[in-house]
Amino acid sequence: MNGLMKANALRSVIAAAAVCAAGAATAEAASPAAPAKSAEERGAWFREARFGMFIHWGVYSIPAMGEWAYAQKPWKPGEYEAFAAKFNPTRYNPREWARLAKAAGMKYAVLTSRHHDGFCMFDSHFTDYKITKSPYGRDAVREFVDAFRAEGLKVGFYHSLPDWTHPGYADKESPEFIQRGELHVPTPEQYAAFKELVFNHVRQLMTEYGKIDLLFLDYTSKYKADEDYFDRERILSMVYACQPDILVNDRLSYWKDNCRDFDYYTPEICVPNQPQKVKGRPVMWETCATINDNWGFAKDDNNWKTPEAIVAGLVGCVSRDGNLLLNVGPNELGEIPAPAVERLKAVADWFKTNGESVTGCGKSDFRPPFGCAYTQKGSVVYCHFLQPPLGDTILPGLKGKVERITLLRTGEEVGQDNVWGFELLLPDEQRIRTRGLRAGDVLKMELKKQ
C-alpha cells in the first residue's frame, strides 16, 4: 500500500469512528455511509450457514400470551409495566441454548434486545424499563452474546423500532388502537425524542457488545407507512460505521421496496416459491418461522411443528437459495419449553448424518422428482425426500450424469437401473432404487466430471 492509499484508508477509518462515536448532531450531518464490502462479500458466512435460531424473550413471557401480550387485552395503567418488577429468569442458561442450537445445525442466533412493548433486555443507558432494573439485575443480551460466541456461533440482535410505551410513537397496531380504536398522534417534540431514543439504543447495541454479525430491525407501523419514519439513512450510516461487516435486514421501512439499502430480505412464516429478487436484483433472504404458533412464550400454544416439518422447511429454504431462522420462545424463568427442546434434538439427530446437504448448499438447476427437493454444492446434488417414496424414483435430466448415489443415513450406495421395461422413460430420465426410504432421507448424488 503506497503512502496516498494509506492516508486515504486512515481517513476512512477516522471518519467511520467519528460517526460511530459521535452524538446525534454529528451522525445526522454525515452523508449516508456505504459499507466498504458488498452485501455478498459480507454475507458469505450467511449463505454458508443456512440455519439459525431466533429467540423472542422478554417480560411478555410472564403473562405467557405471546410477544404481543401488551396489545392483546386492555391492561390497567401500569399493570403490564409492573411485570418488569417480577422478571427474574433464574434458570436462564444461554450456554445451554447455544449448545442446543449448535447440535441442531444452526450456525447463528438472533435475540430480541427489545420488542414492541419497549422493555430492554440489555442495560440501556436511556431508560429504566430494562432487565438490569428487574430482580434478575443482569444484562441478558451480554450473556447471550458471550455464550453463543463461546460455542462458535455468529450473533445478531432483533431490535424493535416501534415502542408502544413511548409517547413519540404512533401506530395503528398499538394497544390503544387495537383495543379502543384510538390513534395517539405525537407532538413534534415527542416524535423527535422518540427517534433519538431509537438511534441511541441501536448505537449502544452496535458499540458495547463486540462484533455483531447481523441486525434484524423490525417495523410494524401502518401509520405513515410510506414515509421514512425512523431516519433510516442516519441509522444505517451509524450501523455500518460501527460494524463494517454486519448484515442489516430490510425492515427499516414498512414496505421492502421503500427501503433503499438493505442486505437481506426477510419473508415471515412462509417459504417463497423461488430464489428472491428485489427490484430485479437477486438478494440474500431468510424466512423466519415459529416452532409453534407464537413468537413469544404462550402457555396455551401446543401446536408444535414436527421435526419432519422443520427439516422440510429448512430444505425448502435452502433449495431456493435462502436461510431458515427458526424461533423459540423461552418462558419467564429463562427455559426453552421442553417440546421445543425435544424437536430441536430430533433435528440434531437428522443433522448428524444429513447436515452436509444443507450447510453451504443452495439451489440446483436440475428438476427434482415427485415428493423431493434438491440442494446442491459444487458437483454434488442432494435429493431430499419430503415424503416416503411410493417405490423407486425417476430422476429427470440425470441419466448418464451421476457417478455415485449414497444414502446419507446409512452410507450405503443406491443402485441405478437403466432398463426396467414396465414404464416409458424419457431419454434423460434415470430410475433409481428407493424402496424403503422414509421422509427426511437424503441421497448424495455425485455428478460425473464433464
Q: What function would you assign to each model-found segment?
A:
Residues 2-14:
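Bacterial N-terminal signal peptides that target proteins for export
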